[in-house]
């Protein structure tokens, strides 16, 4: 069974996957319950496959999302989809040279454009060059970043490709292809490619 909760007005759940009609389905292909904001609180592995991500999906503090090599995640344009790892959360996206993990637009090939969806945001507890704790991340979502743990670990990004991201939530406040905020040295970043972003790649 899915275990639900809330943080303020935002629903939380220990499962990520649903059907198109928002039905709970541990083998579904839609990431998120269809709400604009959704907090994942748990540990889950996305098996190799193709998924549609809807809305702003937060990987909450203490939660771990693992994505298998060869997986394709398409960001929904209507809901400005974005995957946001909060401080204390982890994303284990460990692709391979022959089976990278791809985040891309849900638009048909030939119709994809920069800014079709949000992007990836990774927030940690390390010090930042602003010297500010709990600093608001660029781009619009609620998440803050910054602490004093320079060895903080936000997970693994290896052989990951991000395409057509950078939706402008507000004027001049686009998400980068991948946004890093106060990410610590315990995080593994290796062989990343960002293409056709509407804002900065990183």
Language-model regions: role of each:
Residues 1-201:
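Beta-strand/loop edge motif enriched in small/polar residues
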């Amino acid at each position: 069974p899915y275990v639900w909760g809330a943080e303020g007005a935002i629903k939380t759940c220990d499962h990520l996957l649903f059907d198109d009609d928002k039905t709970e389905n541990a083998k579904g292909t839609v990431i998120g319950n269809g709400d604009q904001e959704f907090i994942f609180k748990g540990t889950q592995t996305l098996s190799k496959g193709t998924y549609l991500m809807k809305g702003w999906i937060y990987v909450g503090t203490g939660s771990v999302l693992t994505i298998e090599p060869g997986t394709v995640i398409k960001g929904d344009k209507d809901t400005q989809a974005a995957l946001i790892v909060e401080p204390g959360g982890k994303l284990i996206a460990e692709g391979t040279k022959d089976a990278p993990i791809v985040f891309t637009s849900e638009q048909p090939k030939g119709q994809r454009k920069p800014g079709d969806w949000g992007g990836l945001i990774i927030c940690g507890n390390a010090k930042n060059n602003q010297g500010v704790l709990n600093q608001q991340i660029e781009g619009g979502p609620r998440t803050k970043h910054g602490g004093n743990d320079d060895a903080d670990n936000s997970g693994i990004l290896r052989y990951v490709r991000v395409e057509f991201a950078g939706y402008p939530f507000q004027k001049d406040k686009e998400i980068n292809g991948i946004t890093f905020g106060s990410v610590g040295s315990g995080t593994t970043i290796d062989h990343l490619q960002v293409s056709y972003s509407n804002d900065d790649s990183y």
